[in-house]
A protein has these predicted regions:
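Fe-S-dependent hydro-lyases/dehydratases of central metabolism
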Residues: 1-218
Length: 218
């Protein structure tokens, strides 16, 4: 259904991801009365920050995560040899246009490259999703950046987004959604689009979006 800027909506979450910095998510799950996750197939655990572990505490955290996954029947445990969370989600083909992707990582905006709503949250919000399958959001203001012209040799997607952030500032997009569009964006590969969307959080954006096209579907 249609929504308006500033409206509060309670949404079903398609992918809930937790990285190994956030063992508190598991603790919060039980502190909030959680017994069984809403849908084990929609929850993904990533060991990508402490990989490999540098301390006993980090190793113990991984042990607790593995135990939780076993008890809850969560099969999507991306252990220390699987890769970085957002790249794994892309490589596995788990993100699709129109889906809501929530991960305990600020760069979850990456998944706007696939036409999905991707945003980062903290431990309590993610625990809420694990219990209910839902999370509330305030519909953000949207601004669009149209990129036209032709890139000079050696200019990459990272250069584009860093230039945009430099022009607009680190707080320009706070609780806003950015749409990247125009001929330049249309000519970018999916990896380049992921780079653009990933870095949008560095100007404060709640989420990012690129209209799905043939590149997305491929």
């Amino acid at each position: 259904h249609q929504v308006a800027t500033g409206e509060i909506v309670n949404c079903d979450v398609d992918i809930a991801g937790i990285n190994d910095l956030y063992l508190q998510t598991v603790r919060s799950f039980y502190e909030m009365g959680g017994e069984k996750v809403f849908d084990a197939d929609k929850i993904v655990m990533f060991f990508d920050h402490y990989a490999p572990c540098a301390t006993i505490t980090q190793a113990e955290n991984h042990k607790q995560f593995r135990k939780f996954c076993f008890e809850q029947g969560i099969e999507k445990l991306m252990d220390i040899d699987q890769g970085v969370c957002h790249q794994v989600l892309a490589d596995k083909g788990w993100v699709h246009p129109g889906e809501i992707v929530v991960v305990t990582d600020s760069h979850t905006t990456t998944h706007g490259a696939f036409g999905a709503f991707g945003t980062g949250v903290g431990a309590t919000d993610l625990a809420t999703i694990m219990i209910t399958g839902k999370l509330w959001f305030m519909v953000p203001e949207i601004f669009r950046i149209n990129l036209v012209g032709k890139l000079q040799p050696g200019v990459l997607a990272k250069d584009i987004i860093l230039h945009i952030i430099g022009d607009l500032g680190a707080d320009y997009g706070v609780y806003k959604a950015v749409e990247f569009a125009g001929p330049v964006v249309n000519g970018l590969s999916i990896s380049e689009r992921m780079c653009m969307c990933n870095m949008s959080t560095e100007m404060g954006c709640k989420t990012s979006y690129i209209q799905p096209d043939a590149v997305t579907m491929e």
